[in-house]
Amino acid sequence: MSLTNEQIVDAIAEKSLMEVMELVKAIEEKFGVSAAAPVAVAAAAGPAAAVEEQTEFTVTLKSAGDKKVEVIKAVRAITGLGLKEAKDLAEAGGVLKEGASKEDAEKMKKDLEAAGATVEVK
């Protein structure tokens, strides 16, 4: 008697998780294969390596939030702009610094977020 694929799937569905794990292990041993997906692991490692290579970052102010005065002070400290220019930048948002090192970008983001701003680092 030959079983159909549907009958096999139904029989597996009735088994407990432990029984299915034992079945998978037995199939791996019998046919010399692995149920793991090595292609997915290799693909996931590629983008991570590309992220580590980035050395220059752009710090962008998205929103000043509720504490505009604190954000304006932080913008002035980071950019060296005058009060009016810093106020305009804080209210409108925009790029604060391009080509910043990772450490500088993280410090700017930390300082601006502490002041109440929403910041994006790319």
UniProtKB/Swiss-Prot annotation:
InterPro entries: Ribosomal_bL12, Ribosomal_bL12_C, Ribosomal_bL12_C/ClpS-like, Ribosomal_bL12_oligo, Ribosomal_bL12_oligo_N_sf. One of its GO terms (molecular function) is structural constituent of ribosome. It comes from the Bacteria. Transmembrane segments: none annotated. SUPFAM superfamilies: ClpS-like (SSF54736), Ribosomal protein L7/12, oligomerisation (N-terminal) domain (SSF48300). Pfam families: Ribosomal_L12, Ribosomal_L12_N. Forms part of the ribosomal stalk which helps the ribosome interact with GTP-bound translation factors. Is thus essential for accurate translation. This is Large ribosomal subunit protein bL12. The gene is rplL.
